Amino acid sequence: GCVLANRLSKNQKNKVLLIEAGGKDNYPWIHIPVGYYKTMHNPKVDWCFHTEKDESMNNRSIRYPRGKTLGGSSSINGLLWIRGQSNDYDNWRQQGNNGWGWDDVLPYFIKSENNELGKNEFHNDSGPIMVANKKIKLTTLEEFINASAEKGIPKVNDFNTGDNFGVGYYQFT
């Protein structure tokens, strides 16, 4: 929604009206990185959806937070910047969704970023979305990462390369 509206509004010939079901994103917890927890299942900013029951999960359904505020789900995602596994995108393409494979969408991810890691095969340094690393390293998290590595879980230095199985610090917007 917002991304498309922004792109369309760059052409002065276009007039764009963006309608969101929720209100302004002035709920304080939206703007605090750890505050995403307070947005989940809060009907003020979340649609409070649940998945269908799944036999492989003992017929449980799980919460599926979806933003009901200006900015949609991007406003309640904890400011995380994680693209997802490349094989998930490739599976979408294999199911007939041409244009949705990892190699198809990666250029758009790259184009959108202004990443403090700089420009490389997975990142850009001149896009509209500022992406940054966590500035503070917490001892507890470092110990968790090291313990995970001792158990054979790989350390991931960049969760946006398409192979994000492992443990590490993720980036923020």
Role assignments for model-derived ranges:
Residues 93-173:
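Conserved redox-cofactor binding core of oxidoreductases
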